[in-house]
Design a protein with these regions (language model features):
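Bacterial Sec-dependent N-terminal signal peptides
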Residues: 1-22
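Polar/charged alpha-helical tracts
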Residues: 9-14, 40, 65, 97
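Sec-dependent signal peptide cleavage junction
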Residues: 29-48
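GH16 jelly-roll
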Residues: 45-269
């Protein structure tokens, strides 16, 4: 069983110009444990910042006023030929011990051989510009694809990639690195991103995004590893000056990680 470990206290913090959004810590791993994370001034925050959104995951269930589920297999495996069926079952996503757990399982369900969960704040919370971060411990196994990311809130009317996509953190297979990437429409699909250096992704690290009208900057543990200019809509990047919402998921297989999946990494339950 793969677990996107607990989004525990302050898994995510979004610091806007005069606003701060806080979430908790996230972990995506085969076993569960997560340290508490407290909100404190971080990159992008100022003394005039105000917390505008947070989730402490200190209840008994996922807060439906903050999070929604995407169910099923999506169009063409969510556009990526992913191999899992996303559910809203507590088998795949639940709150326990002050944390959110997202778990990918090896099981036949809905015509697929794997299940998992994909949560988002679409229709519940969106923002334009700010600082957002999550503390994550990730799974590392062939065929696993955890992600902490954002999509433009206008995706329903303009589609992808015209809505824009910001991947704050993605990891695939057993690589000891993560990726930060932007996707948008510039007379066709455009993307620009960069991997981090090697480190142990199975341990907790803080993944952050600083977003303003000039740059999108990506951080791991407070260290910037990549930035992209969006000033004056450089490179047809007008998508990145509009509201976005947050997503968290663990995919299994797909075009990027490939279709060789290590089933031995999914313990029988």
């Amino acid at each position: 069983t793969f677990l996107m470990r607990k989004l525990s206290k302050k898994i995510l913090s979004l610091y806007a110009k005069k606003a701060i959004i806080g979430l908790a810590s996230v972990a995506m791993v085969a076993t569960m444990s997560l340290s508490t994370i407290n909100v404190s001034p971080v990159k992008g925050a100022t003394t005039s910042s105000t917390l505008v959104w947070s989730d402490e995951f200190n209840g008994n269930s996922i807060d439906a006023s903050k999070w929604g589920f995407e169910i099923g297999t999506g169009s063409n495996g969510w556009g990526n030929n992913e191999q899992q069926y996303y559910t809203n079952r507590t088998d795949n996503a639940y709150v326990a011990d002050g944390a959110l757990h997202i778990r990918a399982k090896k099981e036949a369900y809905g015509g697929k051989n794997y299940t998992s969960a994909r949560l988002n704040t679409n229709g519940k919370f969106t923002f334009t510009y700010g600082y957002v971060e999550a503390r994550l411990a990730l799974p590392s196994s062939q065929g696993i694809w955890p992600a902490f990311w954002m999509l433009g809130a206008n995706i329903g009317s303009v589609g992808w990639p015209s809505c824009g996509e910001i991947d704050i953190m993605e990891a695939i297979n057993a690589e000891n690195k993560t990726y930060g990437t932007c996707h948008w429409n510039a007379n066709g699909h455009a993307e620009y991103g960069k991997p981090t250096g090697n480190f142990d992704i199975t341990q907790y690290h803080t993944y952050g995004l600083q977003w303003d009208n000039q740059y999108i900057r990506f951080f791991v543990d407070g260290n910037k590893f990549y930035e992209m200019s969006i000033a004056n809509n450089a490179g047809d990047t007008d998508e990145f000056h509009k509201p976005f919402y947050l997503l968290l998921n663990v995919a299994v297989g797909g075009n990027w990680p490939g279709f060789s999946i290590d089933d031995s990494a999914f313990p029988q339950e």
